[in-house]
From Swiss-Prot:
One of its GO terms (molecular function) is rRNA (cytosine-C5-)-methyltransferase activity. This is Ribosomal RNA small subunit methyltransferase B. It catalyses: cytidine(967) in 16S rRNA + S-adenosyl-L-methionine = 5-methylcytidine(967) in 16S rRNA + S-adenosyl-L-homocysteine + H(+). Keywords: Cytoplasm, Methyltransferase, RNA-binding, rRNA processing, S-adenosyl-L-methionine, Transferase. It comes from Escherichia coli (strain SMS-3-5 / SECEC).
Length: 429
């Protein structure tokens, strides 16, 4: 019989890899979950996501509770204590069990000599919890965001930054996209009801359904047969502006993992779609999504800055550019973003977006539509990016989304329960 793994130590090591090594939790967590029993998968995910969501608070508390930070080979213990604090603050796990399992985690990370230290710090927190939390709630750390990002949000949204931060710190709802080639949304909602679950239609996006309670995908009616796809409502909004038509040649650039590629084909099943992404590994998910939905598209690996390398001189009727960005609009869904991103990344990403826009524009037919989209809330990547593009591109015209002075449509996190997202619809004169 396989020895029971210590979930607390696994969570601590995963968070350490995110914060100290810059690895994405999306890459780290799935292989870890394969190592634990089905009943423990959800708890492992909760511990990892929860610690990353509240990292500022947990770090602040440790600095108050310990005279010196844990460094070097003992650094993992710092994150193990974070996991312990998170359980005491945010879970229903009985405190004695949370303490015992966290202390035992020291053995799993080969630091058994520090069991007493871990136990002492966590018990000290229990004794001082009320006064520590009162002090924390009066500090800037209470916003649970790195200071550089907080400053950018305050500058860009002087009236709204607090609501953005609050939305980022919430657990996200689960949004689905009903495949209209199989069922109407109303029909699928009836099937969902028959399966004992409840969903709510989005007022503006015709395929979007929000589950009352998140559920595993295998429990959703027809998921394996392509009847429904997990996709946030704001991401589904891209199709409102792209408006793909049958018979058109359409490019989905920066396409992985393929959610928007398949949405194009649901709306326009007879469109000729080319899906391109620079990341060959992530392209495998585009193939997986196409296969599950029984769809066909031309899938290519390529760099958006050099389109002639993968499409020659070909032009398209419509282009969806879901540009690489800071992902500051989806922090509630991916809390590791707060700790993976740095302030210096923003101008670098804006430059990359600018290069891709300039490179792909000649591949749009005259009269064609390009939708520029990001899951960012930062103006440098969004309205300012499009404003600069319009100023230097004589044959580009903004359509339906904003004004030349304030181009694009910005959805903020939590608005209509969707992610933060930006769209700009451009027409080639």
């Amino acid at each position: 019989m396989k020895k029971q793994r210590n979930l607390r130590s696994m969570a601590a090591q995963a968070v350490e890899q995110v914060v100290e090594q810059g690895q994405s939790l999306s890459n780290i967590l799935p292989p870890l979950q394969q190592k634990v029993s089905d009943k423990d998968k959800a708890l492992l995910q909760e511990l990892c996501f929860g610690v990353l969501r509240t990292l500022s608070q947990l770090d602040w508390l440790i600095n108050k509770l310990m005279a010196r930070p844990m460094t070097g080979k003992q650094r993992t213990v710092h994150y193990l204590i974070m996991v312990g604090l998170y359980q005491l603050l945010y879970t229903r796990i009985p405190p004695h069990a949370a303490l015992a399992e966290t202390v035992e985690g020291a053995i799993a990370i080969k630091r058994p000599q520090l069991k007493g230290l871990i136990n002492g710090v966590l018990r000290q927190f229990q004794r001082q919890q009320e006064e520590l939390l009162a002090e924390f709630n009066a500090s800037d750390a209470r916003y649970l965001h790195p200071s550089w990002l907080l400053k950018r949000l305050q500058k860009a949204y002087p009236e709204q930054w607090q609501s953005i931060v609050e939305a980022n710190n919430q657990r996200p709802p689960m949004w689905l996209r009903v495949n209209r080639t199989h069922h109407s949304r109303d029909r699928w909602l009836a099937l969902l009801d028959e399966a004992g679950m409840k969903g709510f239609p989005h007022a503006d996006y015709p395929d979007a359904v929000r589950l009352e309670t998140p559920a595993p995908v295998h429990a959703l009616p027809g998921f394996e047969d392509g009847w429904v796809t997990v996709q946030d409502a704001s991401a589904q909004g891209c199709m409102t502006w792209l408006a793909p038509q049958n018979g058109e040649h359409i490019l989905d650039l920066c396409a992985a993992p393929g959610g928007k590629t398949t949405h194009i084909l649901e709306v326009a099943p007879e469109a000729q779609v080319v899906a391109v992404d620079i990341d060959e590994q992530r392209l495998s998910r585009v193939y997986d999504n196409l296969k599950r939905l029984g769809m066909k598209a031309t899938v290519k690996q390529g760099d958006g800055r050099y389109p002639s390398q993968w499409c020659g001189e070909q032009q398209f009727d419509r282009i969806l550019l879901d540009a690489p960005c800071s992902a500051t609009g989806v922090i509630r869904r991916h809390p590791d973003i707060k700790w993976l991103r740095r302030d210096r990344d923003i101008p670098e990403l804006a430059q990359l977006q600018s290069e891709i826009l300039d490179a792909i524009w000649p591949h749009l037919k005259s009269g064609g539509t390009l939708v520029y989209a990001t899951c960012s809330v930062l103006p440098e990547e969004n309205s300012l990016q499009i404003k600069a593009f319009l100023q230097r591109t004589a044959d580009a015209e903004l359509c339906e989304t904003g004004t030349p002075e304030q181009p694009g449509k910005q959805n903020l996190p939590g608005a209509e329960e969707g992610d933060g997202f930006f769209y700009a619809k451009l027409i080639k004169k």
